[in-house]
Curated annotation (Swiss-Prot):
Name under which the protein is recorded: Ribosomal RNA small subunit methyltransferase J
Pfam families: SAM_MT
Gene Ontology MF: a single term: rRNA (guanine-N2-)-methyltransferase activity
Name of the gene this protein is made from: rsmJ
Taxonomy, superkingdom: Bacteria
InterPro entries in the cross-refs: 16SrRNA_methylTrfase_J (IPR007536), SAM-dependent_MTases_sf (IPR029063)
Organism expressing this protein natively: Actinobacillus succinogenes (strain ATCC 55618 / DSM 22257 / CCUG 43843 / 130Z)
GO cellular component annotations of the record: cytoplasm
Amino acid sequence: MMIQLRSEIKTDENLTALFRRQCEAAGLIHDETSPLALVQAAMGEHDWRLELRKLDEPKLGAVFVDFAGGVMAHRRKFGGGRGEAVAKAIGVKGEELPTVIDATAGLGRDAFVLASVGCRVRLVERHPVVRLLLQDGLRRAYDDSEIGESMRRNMQLLTVNHIAELDPARDFADAVYLDPMYPHKQKSALVKKEMRVFQHLVGTDSDADALLEPARKLARKRVVVKRPDYAGFLAQTPPHFSRETKNHRFDIYLPLI
């Protein structure tokens, strides 16, 4: 994939070399003309994070993954916990904490909610840039003194690029979660920023329908598909039941035995 690759680290050649190796392994090629840039941004003297920037729209700011601070820290401390819609849809109830495969992990937000209530979540992300952003966020979360231990236990990024590469006999989970990219109508600042950057990067998941069947083969209890309230069913397949929220719908499918 062609994208601008930038490092803002000026004092540690080992860190810039690490960034280059990560990009090469992900198949990223530097393109000076690309309006999108993956940036290794400095955080103090000895730390860094990866950011995705849309250079022709700098007011959008940078997109990055931060599980230990900001919005995600607030959500972990003051959010609904087990009462969050995604947790209910996955099947969190009482002492029941399903194991989960998040097959469209993205920036890992919903997976983090599930991990924060105690679910063990394995993540799959196929887009190389998004995967690097997620991997970087997990790296820093694993090192965090407050959440590091639970994050290492409950959130794991798998090496596969697609759930079809997983073996239902060995790699199954109680629940498989799907949240494919879909054109958004919402106008909130967060959605507007991230969707404008992300849709420029990956577009919509035009082959998202192909996720449903392998997900139903991997799931032992349910597949949960998050959809905007105005969207049709994934793969034009009616769910067995749905849970509705203000702006979204969780379509729930039973496994294929």
